[in-house]
Regions:
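NAD(P)-binding Rossmann-fold cofactor-contacting core
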Residues: 2-17
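Residue immediately C-terminal to the conserved phosphorylatable aspartate in receiver
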Residues: 9, 27, 45
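Phosphate-binding loop of NTP-binding sites
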Residues: 18, 32-36, 45-192, 196-200
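Conserved SAM-binding strand-loop segment of SAM-dependent methyltransferases
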Residues: 22-29
Length: 200
């Protein structure tokens, strides 16, 4: 029971999203001017942390979270049935290959598993799919992990770290810290042949 508004500067994209989701939409500048209307902001991973709307929302004490974080919370709250197993793969290189291999291994082991996130279907589609997916093998980017404050996967894989997306994160340390969040998993797998990964 929440009121949802879509904010997008691209009018065509906003209109399309409004039609598909059957919700109202506004320009981000209007949302910025009317922040008091909102209780939280769910952001696209494409929006950088220094986006005026997101900075203002955080300064106003609003929670800013990503779509993956929202899906995780809904899943853990059993909104779509019993919580799923989350296996999250990240790193600078090799994410897609590793995620695909891991999903295939889980499928061959008899699990209803699917590669999701940045490959395959979105996490939102996966958790709400009519045919239940029990194991989400998710390839997640540093952008998605940045906006994930409560996401603790059942299995977390950090393959490697190299300088990437510094313009988005602001520093190598911030980029690496976002990636390293997956190591909070009860079962964490790290590429320890990588000197940067060893620091986490």
């Amino acid at each position: 029971n929440v009121d949802v508004l879509i904010a997008d500067a691209n009018e065509t994209a906003r209109d399309r999203a409004m039609e598909v989701a059957d919700v109202a939409g506004i320009h981000p500048d209007q949302a910025l001017a009317e922040l008091s209307r909102f209780s939280c902001v769910v952001t696209s991973p494409g929006w950088r942390p220094d986006t005026p709307l997101l900075r203002a929302a955080q300064a106003a004490g609003l929670e800013v979270l990503g779509d993956v974080e929202l899906c995780y919370r809904l899943d853990r709250a059993s909104v779509f049935g019993p919580p799923r197993t989350w296996m999250v793969v990240t790193g600078t290189n090799g994410k897609t290959t590793t995620t695909s291999m891991l999903a295939s291994i889980m499928q061959h082991a008899g699990y209803q598993a699917e590669a999701v996130g940045n490959i395959g279907v979105s996490v939102a589609e996966a958790v709400s799919a009519p045919q239940r997916i029990d194991v989400l093998v998710a390839e997640l980017s540093s952008f998605q992990l940045h906006w994930s404050s409560q996401l603790v996967p059942d299995v977390g894989v950090l393959l490697n770290l190299a300088e990437d997306h510094i313009d988005w994160h602001g520093s190598m340390a911030a980029y690496a810290a976002a990636k390293a969040k997956v190591l909070a998993a009860p079962l964490a797998i790290a590429g320890l042949d990588d000197a940067l990964v060893q620091q986490y």
